[in-house]
Amino acid sequence: MIELKEVVKEYRTKNKEVLAVDHVNLSIRAGSIYGVIGFSGAGKSTLIRMFNHLEAPTSGEVIIDGDHIGQLSKNGLRAKRQKVNMIFQHFNLLWSRTVLKNIMFPLEIAGVPRRRAKQKALELVELVGLKGREKAYPSELSGGQKQRVGIARALANDPTVLLCDEATSALDPQTTDEILDLLLKIREQQNLTIVLITHEMHVIRRICDEVAVMESGKVIEHGPVTQVFENPQHTVTKRFVKEDLNDDFETSLTELEPLEKDAYIVRLVFAGSTTTEPIVSSLSTAYDIKINILEANIKNTKNGTVGFLVLHIPYISSVDFGKFEKELIERQVKMEVLRHG
């Protein structure tokens, strides 16, 4: 379990004070994958660096597995950091060392005997899918392979928490998915708690159980990924979801001709089993109305499926529209009116 209580990080310069993290409270379940998303400057990198005390909070508490990180002795903090390890956007590999020796490096620092360190490193090479590349140098590896080395190295001391600082930002989409699949596999095999920060909703949707959205140092929205994706509340969250959906339909609305009286354009959001139900056809039949599908999209999250439909209803009375809306609520389908004639 990881808890952040009223965590603040303030930087003082000659001319001003910058509040990078502003009274953040989070609770992260052991064994879960927790995502923190935000645009550049939101404070997410500063936040994650306080988990292992690479940055000390100005105030507030960071508690991991019952240990108050800021209250640990130097030796206690050193030991804790071996259990709260980190992977980085730009890999941070030692270019003069081979794959195997990069992975052995933290074991050497920890004083693990060479034979045991080599055996552990070989096991990790296999775990991350680099068997046969043990003697290669970082300059001979692709970006995805370098990140696999970074992950293996971070796992060398058997951590309980893995921190991922924009770990896929430098990778192409296919390699990103491969690294995300690897993180899922590692979490399942080693029961790790993974905390990752990103500016890509795709990453959050793909592997995270829960998400926190940051803006200007504050957590502005948080909760289970499917719930946040299905029903984003804050403008920033809505923007991330739209970008993931490649949804610019609301912009296109301004180019449409005015709707006739009693016509509607609505967006429906489905989750779980409702994504496979023939809701549109059944409602069309029930209310004897014509429904045009203007846009459709389905996205998979780690814990379920979310579907989106934009519909044009040329005519429906206000009474029937009220019944239509009520039936959607009963079917656990969310509706947003985009335009009304």
From Swiss-Prot:
Residues 2-241 form the ABC transporter domain. ATP binds at residues 38-45. It comes from the Bacteria. Its EC number is 7.4.2.11. GO terms for molecular function: ABC-type D-methionine transporter activity; ATP binding; ATP hydrolysis activity. It is an enzyme of class 7 (translocase). It is found in: Cell membrane. It holds the Pfam family NIL. Keywords: Amino-acid transport, ATP-binding, Cell membrane, Membrane, Nucleotide-binding, Translocase, Transport. PROSITE patterns: ABC_TRANSPORTER_1 (PS00211), ABC_TRANSPORTER_2 (PS50893), METN (PS51264). It is a peripheral membrane protein. GO terms for cellular component: plasma membrane. It catalyses: L-methionine(out) + ATP + H2O = L-methionine(in) + ADP + phosphate + H(+); D-methionine(out) + ATP + H2O = D-methionine(in) + ADP + phosphate + H(+). The complex is composed of two ATP-binding proteins (MetN), two transmembrane proteins (MetI) and a solute-binding protein (MetQ). Belongs to the ABC transporter superfamily. Methionine importer (TC 3.A.1.24) family. Part of the ABC transporter complex MetNIQ involved in methionine import. Responsible for energy coupling to the transport system. This is Methionine import ATP-binding protein MetN 2. It comes from Staphylococcus aureus (strain Mu50 / ATCC 700699).
